[in-house]
């Protein structure tokens, strides 16, 4: 695994993919040109992957299909990954347990869904008021994030890899306008991760619900509000028909999904298949980030015309200040009680200070000077 992790940092996913495909093409041409003795075909290694998403789920599910297709192509069919959606395995929020138990060799989900089992898994999705996607990817691959994630997941018998980023998420769909902290009291909201802890501290009744059940829960009044992703996915799910107030984000500035691999299964693979799988996961993750950004931009451009019922809102400075204060207090409490939590928090905080200075003088300065 150590060598595999070093390779992850050494190679750029797309460059290596191109090189591997070129190498494979040359090898096939050479094999076709030269007569060879017939050799018995190797029996394919067939893995199963369980995903949180339902059949045909856009963007998230597409990333999993892309990864599996790349693995099969680059391995010449030596490794095949078959995908089971939540419709089949019926355990959308049980992916970690199934991969850990070896019921599935792989999984695709979001790390913060496991905070009830291990609070430190939250850090590897996103944290309120934390890093944006470029900063977070840099932390993962060059700032120690991968090492810390391995340390957390080792105890679960699982390797975890970045599985695709949504970018900055919207703050949620609400039935009624939220104008003050009093409006949040007793509000029932679906929101996962550490952001849920923050809102609970402010009086919100927080729950987590599987993606396939969100619309029904909102429609039946089981919840008063929910956050999901952003325009790339939310509008097609129809939340605006029930809860038209759509708030800008604060809680998930760079939500990273997650590929999980059973540790014993991965270690049993030949080295070249480990490398192929790692490259395919990395490429599929970044491709999902680009796709999510594209779809959000396209949907946002037409939101007023196509979805006139949507009312865009931003939380007041008073509410944002209270969220930040609650976030800081909860982080301090958790860090004092858990050395591992403290280690990861300090790593992210230190890296964000470095990265944010560059973000301010590069992207932020450019946008500030060029936004119309």
Where on the chain are the PLM-derived regions?
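Bacterial N-terminal signal peptides that target proteins for export
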Residues: 2-14
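Glycine-centered signal
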Residues: 2-5, 23-25, 33
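Hydrophobic alpha-helical segments, principally membrane-spanning helices and signal/leader peptides
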Residues: 10-13, 118, 142, 247
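Bacterial N-terminal signal peptides
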Residues: 15-22
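N-terminal secretory/targeting leader peptides
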Residues: 26-136, 153-372
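A gly/proline- and charged-residue-enriched helix-loop-helix capping module
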Residues: 132-150
């Amino acid at each position: 695994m150590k060598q595999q992790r070093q390779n992850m940092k050494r190679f750029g996913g797309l460059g290596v993919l191109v090189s591997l495909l070129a190498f494979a093409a040359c090898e096939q041409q050479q094999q076709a040109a030269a007569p060879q003795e017939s050799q018995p075909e190797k029996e394919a290694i067939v893995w199963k992957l369980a995903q949180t998403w339902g059949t045909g789920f856009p963007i998230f599910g597409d990333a999993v299909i892309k990864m599996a297709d790349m693995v099969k192509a680059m391995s010449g069919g030596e490794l095949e990954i078959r995908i089971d959606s939540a419709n089949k395995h019926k355990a959308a929020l049980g992916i970690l347990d199934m991969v850990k138990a070896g019921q599935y060799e792989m999984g695709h989900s979001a790390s913060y869904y496991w905070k009830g089992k291990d609070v430190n898994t939250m850090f590897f999705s996103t944290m309120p008021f934390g890093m944006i996607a470029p900063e977070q990817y840099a932390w993962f691959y060059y700032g120690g994030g991968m090492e810390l994630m391995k340390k957390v997941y080792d105890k679960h018998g699982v390797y975890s890899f970045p599985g695709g980023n949504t970018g900055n998420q919207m703050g949620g769909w609400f039935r009624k306008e939220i104008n003050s902290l009093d409006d949040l009291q007793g509000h029932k909201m679906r929101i996962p991760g550490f952001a849920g802890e923050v809102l609970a501290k402010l009086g919100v009744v927080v729950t987590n619900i599987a993606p396939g059940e969100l619309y029904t829960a909102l429609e039946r009044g089981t919840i008063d509000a929910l956050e999901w992703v952003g325009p790339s996915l939310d509008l097609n799910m129809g939340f605006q028909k029930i809860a038209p107030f759509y708030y800008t984000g604060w809680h998930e500035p760079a939500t990273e999904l997650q590929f999980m691999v059973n540790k014993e299964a991965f270690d049993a693979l030949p080295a070249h298949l480990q490398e192929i799988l790692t490259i395919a996961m990395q490429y599929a993750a970044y491709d999902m980030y680009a796709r999510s950004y594209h779809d959000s931009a396209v949907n946002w451009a037409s939101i007023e015309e196509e979805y006139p019922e949507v009312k865009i809102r931003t939380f007041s400075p008073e509410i944002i200040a209270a969220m930040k204060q609650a976030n800081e207090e909860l982080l301090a409490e958790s860090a004092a009680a858990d050395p591992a939590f403290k280690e990861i928090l300090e790593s992210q905080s230190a890296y964000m200070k470095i990265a944010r200075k560059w973000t301010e003088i590069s992207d932020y300065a450019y946008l500030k000077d060029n936004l119309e």
